[in-house]
Amino acid sequence: MPRNGFFGVKNSHIAILKDEDEFTYETPVKVPGTVEIKMEPSVETNTSYADNEPWIDKTQDNGGSGTISFYDTESTTELRKLFADLVGFDIDAKGRVLGTSGKTPKKFAFMCEQPGHVIGKRRCFLACQIKAPSMDSKTIEDKPDITQLDYDLTWRPVTLSTGWRGSFYDSYSDLEDYAKFFDKVDTQLTLASASEVA
């Protein structure tokens, strides 16, 4: 068996969720300059006791939270409009970003790639939201530091029309659909039969 490992992150794409009831998405848009992605799932397990023994074990998937960091979400009109929609901001008639208050951010699918030593991986989180970014800007010293934009991210599980419930799906470079992974968000996810998995 070959030894594999995943290295870095690239190819971030975002697809705005158009219809939360039907789970239809806009075409994924590539976002350049991915620096870092941190993901922390939130899965809680609780045991109820009765008759002096464990009675029911219940696990609940609450999605998760983390941070996605980019060097560039503002260099084009399209990126500024996309991220304004994602954080609940607006664009004015002159093309400026307005830090609007009280507007609901749009939900979206977040897609990215981790190259591998032998096998690469691409992942899609289906129902994400972000907040306006934090950043740390400082004077240029001996070397220029590019300002990094850090977006707090949350995601949650969804139930698709196929009956499948979950938060994300992965594809791998040895699978047939890998080359077209970023073409669209796949919402026709179904479980393999026992014979297909064996």
Question: At which residue positions do the language-model features occur?
Answer:
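Short acidic (Asp/Glu) patches
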Residues: 46-54, 87-97, 133-138
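Ordered, amphipathic secondary-structure segments that act as subunit-interaction surfaces
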Residues: 62-104
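Mixed-charge, glycine-accented linear interaction segment located at domain edges/termini
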Residues: 128-198
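N-terminal interaction modules that seed assembly of large macromolecular complexes
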Residues: 30-66
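Beta-strand elements of well-folded, non-transmembrane domains
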Residues: 70-74, 114-118, 129-132, 155-159
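Short helix-loop boundary/capping segments
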Residues: 99-131
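Oligomerization/assembly interface segments of phage tail-like spikes and tubes
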Residues: 53-78, 145-158
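Polar/acidic, low-complexity leader/linker segments enriched in S/T/G and N/D
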Residues: 1-37, 194-198
